[in-house]
Structures are given as C-alpha cells and as structure tokens.
C-alpha cells in the first residue's frame, strides 16, 4: 500500500508541469517596459544594443543570440535581468 501511494505521488509530480519559466523584458528601446514568459527550457535573457542614424537601438528578449561585430550583447540568467 505504501509503495502504491509513493508511486502515485512520484507519477503526479512528474506529470504536473512544475517547470519554472524565465521572464525577460522584450520592449524596444523607445517603448514602455513589457516582459514575457520565455519558452520552456530557455533560461537566458538578452539585451542587444547597436547604433544607427537614429541613435542607440536596444532590443531585448529571451535567449542569448549570436551577433555580428559592432553589436553589444549582454546575456543574463535571472528574471527581468535584461533591462
């Protein structure tokens, strides 16, 4: 009986979505702050900055993308760390 109960508890824990979802800011530089939940398994946030004729442009989101030279990229691993 105890074994059956333990098995049910383990199966319940495994089947429930107990995974944590990272939250990252995703607003462009000129917009009000917004954030979103990242896809499951995505544990990083990024802040990407570059300059063009409009000035400094900032892009934020989930993940840690590859960037070209001349683009400043900061990646971090906590909620809303990419502001």
UniProtKB/Swiss-Prot annotation:
Pfam families referenced in this protein's UniProt entry, alphabetically: Toxin_cobra-type
Gene Ontology terms, MF aspect: acetylcholine receptor inhibitor activity; ion channel regulator activity; toxin activity
Compartments where found: Secreted
Keywords per UniProt: Acetylcholine receptor inhibiting toxin, Disulfide bond, Ion channel impairing toxin, Neurotoxin, Postsynaptic neurotoxin, Secreted, Signal, Toxin
Domain of life: Eukaryota
CDD domains given in the database record: TFP_snake_toxin
Keyword Signal belongs to the record: yes
Bilayer-crossing regions: none
InterPro entries hit by this protein: Snake_3FTx, Snake_toxin-like_sf, Snake_toxin_con_site, Toxin_cobra-type
Signal peptide: 1-21
GO CC, any one term: extracellular region
Tissue expression per record: Expressed by the venom gland.
Disulfide bonds: 24-45, 38-62, 64-75, 76-81
Similarity section: Belongs to the three-finger toxin family. Short-chain subfamily. Type I alpha-neurotoxin sub-subfamily.
Described purpose of this protein according to its UniProt entry: Binds to muscle nicotinic acetylcholine receptor (nAChR) and inhibit acetylcholine from binding to the receptor, thereby impairing neuromuscular transmission.
Protein name, entry field: Short neurotoxin B
Organism annotation: Laticauda laticaudata
